[in-house]
Amino acid sequence: MPPPRGTPNILEGPGDYDVTSTIHNDTYPAIDPLKADLSGKAVFITGGSKGLGRAMVLSFAKAGASYIAAGARSDMTELAKDVAAAAATAKRSPPKFLPIQLDVTDPQSVENAAVAVKSEFGRCDVVVNNAGVLGRFGGILQTDPQEWWQVLGVNLRGPYLVSRAFLPLLLESELKALVHVTSVAAHLLNPTLSAYQTSKMALLKFSQLVHAEFGSKGLVTFAVHPGNCPTDIMGGPDGLSEHEKLIFVETPEISADTIVYLTSEKRDWLGGRYINVTWDMPELIAMKDEIVQGDKLKVKFIY
């Protein structure tokens, strides 16, 4: 389980313990990708070579996706083997796997990725904007302007460029699912990570704007907090302090399997909303009327 309520936790966000009565830190039967059927569907995931992105790629393979493209700057030779193995273990047909060298901050690189996916797959049903960077800790006066702006380049400009390039393909599909991996940090005020927190809050708003423009056309845009997972962005499990080990307790699999669960069927009413993967998904789905009628899980000004 996540840290008990009351544990000193600078990453505790609104609703962490209150939206659903049950919370999780690892995958669980209700979101098992083996229960999904994404045969015939095509998926594109940025930052797909390692960490959360790698887990997402493998989860979609287990869910039977027929076409999976992963965009990253690093080599994906081993990932291709892992995709085939994951599909075989799940007794699914091996997907066509397309590794794409990608820089999400470069418009031409992103456009080339969209062209490659259309050329190789002829379709794209799900896009996951997962690529992200943390940036250095430090106060505003100690930050390097170029490094500060680079964080926004990856975490905000990247999802914008990818969304813009892939929207025409997504809108031709039936599922039309767009996932932005944001963070609980969007809701927090920890001054030593101003670029990261600014980028993630802006990404929440961008998710709502995409929904406002394309929701009526069937696009479902999710803003997903992937949990506090000790991935490479945090220096891995060995890079955590003893206190941080009490906080960074989520697995990559809960993030990956939750995203597969959310995108495996149309959930239009969740469009433009913030979702924490530690929340119990069946319980969240059962709250549909309350969430829609109260216009909940969105960034807004309340007075």
Curated annotation (Swiss-Prot):
<comment type="function">
    <text>Short chain dehydrogenase; part of the gene cluster that mediates the biosynthesis of azaphilone pigments (MonAzPs), a complex mixture of compounds with a common azaphilone skeleton very widely used as food colorants. Within the pathway, pigC intercepts the very reactive benzaldehyde produced by the nrPKS pigA to reduce the omega-1 carbonyl to the alcohol to provide the first stable enzyme-free MonAzPs intermediate, 6-(4-hydroxy-2-oxopentyl)-3-methyl-2,4-dioxocyclohexane carbaldehyde, also known as M7PKS-1.</text>
</comment>
<comment type="similarity">
    <text>Belongs to the short-chain dehydrogenases/reductases (SDR) family.</text>
</comment>
<protein>
    <recommendedName>
        <fullName>Short chain dehydrogenase pigC</fullName>
        <ecNumber>1.1.1.-</ecNumber>
    </recommendedName>
</protein>
<feature type="active site" description="Lowers pKa of active site Tyr">
    <location>
        <position position="200"/>
    </location>
</feature>
<feature type="binding site">
    <location>
        <position position="231"/>
    </location>
    <ligand>
        <name>NADP(+)</name>
    </ligand>
</feature>
<feature type="active site" description="Proton donor">
    <location>
        <position position="196"/>
    </location>
</feature>
<feature type="binding site">
    <location>
        <position position="196"/>
    </location>
    <ligand>
        <name>NADP(+)</name>
    </ligand>
</feature>
<keyword id="KW-0608">Pigment</keyword>
<dbReference type="InterPro" id="IPR002347">
    <property type="entry name" value="SDR_fam"/>
</dbReference>
<feature type="binding site">
    <location>
        <position position="103"/>
    </location>
    <ligand>
        <name>NADP(+)</name>
    </ligand>
</feature>
<feature type="binding site">
    <location>
        <position position="200"/>
    </location>
    <ligand>
        <name>NADP(+)</name>
    </ligand>
</feature>
<keyword id="KW-0521">NADP</keyword>
<dbReference type="GO" id="GO:0031409">
    <property type="term" value="F:pigment binding"/>
</dbReference>
<dbReference type="InterPro" id="IPR036291">
    <property type="entry name" value="NAD(P)-bd_dom_sf"/>
</dbReference>
<feature type="binding site">
    <location>
        <position position="164"/>
    </location>
    <ligand>
        <name>NADP(+)</name>
    </ligand>
</feature>
<dbReference type="Pfam" id="PF00106">
    <property type="entry name" value="adh_short"/>
</dbReference>
<dbReference type="GO" id="GO:0016616">
    <property type="term" value="F:oxidoreductase activity, acting on the CH-OH group of donors, NAD or NADP as acceptor"/>
</dbReference>
<feature type="binding site">
    <location>
        <position position="130"/>
    </location>
    <ligand>
        <name>NADP(+)</name>
    </ligand>
</feature>
<feature type="binding site">
    <location>
        <position position="45"/>
    </location>
    <ligand>
        <name>NADP(+)</name>
    </ligand>
</feature>
<comment type="pathway">
    <text>Secondary metabolite biosynthesis.</text>
</comment>
<keyword id="KW-0560">Oxidoreductase</keyword>
